[in-house]
């Protein structure tokens, strides 16, 4: 009898401990609101929420914590409720800390541009899953029939199916007023089936909108993802900017993009960075590029493209006479691709930025590009050719090309093999460049003479901001000389802490010690005139 009574008493206590009363839940909301709005070390770093915003967050946190704890309690029907209370408190504390670290303006950030466009943005704060209840809270301004939003960004949040259903209903009601949509990184961590379902919902909701900007990057789309957005992509006839970066764009996915795009006449920006495109995929992208007469900014970097795909892209780009920015970094074009690009660059006279690092161009490809650019792109501002196995053999042509670009602001030739001779030629080439801001010749087997020549040239320029010659073979004396030149502007010199004074040039192991010989080399090359081509 005593044991039975004790068991009954435990069960009664269990009921009293869980669920908490309404007043207890309201009290927790009040306490969290107070904690969130109290100045702390976190608020000094992330900002302090207003009482109104804190109260909304506190209510949402309590609801989520209660749901989690209640589910825990239901899974342990014989428990006394103690563990559920513990989960309730722990989850509330965790979510409250997330909000404090997130800072204010979490609900949405609204910006009004000069042309009157209104921008709705929920990408701020920590990357997180979003379910229906939070979606209703976050997207409330969009659901207001009086809203005038024309641009939206839903990135950095992962939408579940239920949240997507609500979001889709909202987007469907305002799609006619939207001109820019950013859905980058909006299904992260979701199972493939759910992610594709979410994509389909958003696609259907936005079908028929007249967008000028569409960003679907960072979603690991692949062909399935591209086709999940088929109804949206296929209905866009006025696109000016399309971003498909870090999306698993394979050969088949690239073909799907080509198939689904109904019109490319107005596209000015097209970016495919960091995909698994390969040569066959590059051929499909080339077919898109060929039909983009208005293209101004093309990026296809880190896409595993070899010589065959490089040649296809180069030939397609010949049709883009308005191109200003070209980024093909980190592919395997090789010499053949470089020569094809040279032919293309000769007709792209409006280029202002060229990024061709890590393409395996070697001297032959570099010479071809240099000769082509000598007669093209007179307003070039950025030139990057890092990591292309460039030696002094092709530096003469390259220096002549650089000397002809008086608008050049940024030059990156890092991770090549220019050595002193090539470096001194480059230094002479930029002598008259009054707009030069940044030069990177790190990791180029440069010794004292080359380092001194380049430093002397750039340090006296009023516009100059950063020189990087780290990772070379500069002697201790050379380092001291360079540091002394920059003693009044040390922020303009990347520290030389990775320099190796004992570095060996294995092609010339018998080279004599620096010093007088370095001065002789500098003097000899300094008297050379850089040939800038024949008219």
UniProtKB/Swiss-Prot annotation:
GO terms for cellular component: cell division site; cell plate; cytosol; nuclear envelope; nuclear membrane; phragmoplast; spindle. Transmembrane segments: none annotated. Residues 493-535 are annotated as: Disordered. SMART domains: LRR_RI. It is found in: Cytoplasm; Nucleus envelope; Nucleus membrane; Cytoplasm, Cytoskeleton, Spindle. GO terms for biological process: cytokinesis by cell plate formation; protein import into nucleus. Pfam families: LRR_6 (PF13516), WPP (PF13943). Residues 1-115 are annotated as: WPP. GTPase activator for the nuclear Ras-related regulatory protein Ran, converting it to the putatively inactive GDP-bound state. Plays a role in spatial signaling during cell division. The WPP domain is required for the nuclear envelope localization. This is RAN GTPase-activating protein 1. The lineage of its organism: Eukaryota, Viridiplantae, Streptophyta, Embryophyta, Tracheophyta.
């Amino acid at each position: 009898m005593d044991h039975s009574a004790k068991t009954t008493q435990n069960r009664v206590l269990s009921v009293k401990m869980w669920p908490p009363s309404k007043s207890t839940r309201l009290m927790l909301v009040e306490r969290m609101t107070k904690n969130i709005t109290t100045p702390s070390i976190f608020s000094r770093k992330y900002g302090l929420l207003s009482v109104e915003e804190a109260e909304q967050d506190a209510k949402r946190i309590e609801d989520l914590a209660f749901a989690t704890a209640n589910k825990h309690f239901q899974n342990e029907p014989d428990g006394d409720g103690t563990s559920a209370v513990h989960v309730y408190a722990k989850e509330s504390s965790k979510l409250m800390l997330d909000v404090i670290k997130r800072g204010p303006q979490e609900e949405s950030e609204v910006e009004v541009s000069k042309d009157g466009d209104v921008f709705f943005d929920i990408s701020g704060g920590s990357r997180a899953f979003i379910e229906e209840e939070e979606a209703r809270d976050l997207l409330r301004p969009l659901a207001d029939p009086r809203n005038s939003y024309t641009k939206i960004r839903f990135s950095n949040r992962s939408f579940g199916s239920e949240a997507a259903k609500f979001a889709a209903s909202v987007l469907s009601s305002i799609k006619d007023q939207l001109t820019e949509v950013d859905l980058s990184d909006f299904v992260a961590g979701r199972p493939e089936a759910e992610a594709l379902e979410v994509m389909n919902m958003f696609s259907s909701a936005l079908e028929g909108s007249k967008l000028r900007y569409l960003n679907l990057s960072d979603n690991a789309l692949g062909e399935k993802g591209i086709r999940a957005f088929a109804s949206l992509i296929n209905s866009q006839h006025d696109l000016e900017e399309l971003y498909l970066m870090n999306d698993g764009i394979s050969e088949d996915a690239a073909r799907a993009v080509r198939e689904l795009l109904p019109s490319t006449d107005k596209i000015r920006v097209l970016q495919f960075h960091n995909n698994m495109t390969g040569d066959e995929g590059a051929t499909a992208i080339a077919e898109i590029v060929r039909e983009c007469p208005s293209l101004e900014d093309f990026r296809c970097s880190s896409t595993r493209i070899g010589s065959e795909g490089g040649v296809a892209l180069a030939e397609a780009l010949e049709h883009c006479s308005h191109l200003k920015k070209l980024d093909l970094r980190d592919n395997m074009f090789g010499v053949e691709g470089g020569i094809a690009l040279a032919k293309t660059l000769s007709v792209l006279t409006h280029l202002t930025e060229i990024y061709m690092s890590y393409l395996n161009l070697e001297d032959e490809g570099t010479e071809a590009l240099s000769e082509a650019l000598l007669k093209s792109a007179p307003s070039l501002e950025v030139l990057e050719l890092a990591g292309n196995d460039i030696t002094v053999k092709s530096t003469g042509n390259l220096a002549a090309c650089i000397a002809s670009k008086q608008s050049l602001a940024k030059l990156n030739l890092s991770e090549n093999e220019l050595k002193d001779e090539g470096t001194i030629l480059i230094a002479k080439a930029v002598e008259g460049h009054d707009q030069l801001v940044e030069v990177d010749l790190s990791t180029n087997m440069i010794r004292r003479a080359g380092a001194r020549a380049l430093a002397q040239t750039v340090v006296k320029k009023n516009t100059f901001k950063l020189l990087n010659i780290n990772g070379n073979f500069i002697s201790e004396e050379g380092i001291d000389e360079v540091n002394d030149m920059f003693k009044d502007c040390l922020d303009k010199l990347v520290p030389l802490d990775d320099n190796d004074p004992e570095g060996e040039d294995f092609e010339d192991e018998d080279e004599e010690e620096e010093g007088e010989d370095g001065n002789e080399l500098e003097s000899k090359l300094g008297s050379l005139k850089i040939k800038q081509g024949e008219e």
